[in-house]
């Protein structure tokens, strides 16, 4: 009986933390989506290793909403000893766990396919929004400067962009070497071609491979927490009358 009470309290505290983290992510996600410029001013340039090629605000909102719901279900289910809610908590966590494993397998086995899929999504956005959408341009400039890269694949991603068509030059990062992220001379297509600066996707992959132990450790830690939460929720479920 004492063991059951202890696990119940731990379940409530753990999920309360998840609930608060979810609320914080939701708030930040809404802030980034509504006023990304003030967010960048408050926190400075985003870390190059944390750059994303998707809309960061919507990603944070989605992640925050999932954590918010999970935390609420875990807290409420454990506190009220509601078997239905505990089963919902377990089921959602199991789906997330399976999706994470599937995503990791796809990322490892089908890297080329993932690159093609992301190219299909990202390159049109570069062609349309780079140089004209403030937050999008700031994120890409921070990424290209921090990682010493150009575009998603390389400089050719800008060939059909509004930025190149109207300004007749490429972003300066496409003509910079690894020691100098800026260039004084205009970055023409010929110069960008001769410099052949690597694309940001390959640079990020290289960073991940370089820090594979850290990335793997974090992934294993998250998976272990999810498994522990599922085991605890099922223990409470099975011991409730």
UniProtKB/Swiss-Prot annotation:
One of its GO terms (cellular component) is membrane. It comes from the Eukaryota. It holds the Pfam family Tetraspanin. The keyword Transmembrane helix applies. The chain crosses the membrane at residues 12-32, 53-73, 89-109, 212-232. The keyword Glycoprotein applies. Keywords: Cell membrane, Glycoprotein, Lysosome, Membrane, Transmembrane, Transmembrane helix. GO terms for biological process: protein stabilization. Gene3D superfamilies: Tetraspanin. It is a multi-pass membrane protein. Coiled coil: none annotated. Its main location: membrane. Glycans are attached at residue 154. It is found in: Cell membrane; Lysosome membrane. Structural component of specialized membrane microdomains known as tetraspanin-enriched microdomains (TERMs), which act as platforms for receptor clustering and signaling. Participates thereby in diverse biological functions such as cell signal transduction, adhesion, migration and protein trafficking. Regulates neuronal differentiation in response to NGF by facilitating NGF-mediated activation of NTRK1/TRKA receptor tyrosine kinase and subsequent downstream signaling pathways. Plays a role in the inhibition of TNFalpha-induced apoptosis. Belongs to the tetraspanin (TM4SF) family. Interacts with SLC19A2. Interacts with NTRK1/TRKA. This is Tetraspanin-1. It comes from Rattus norvegicus. The gene is Tspan1.
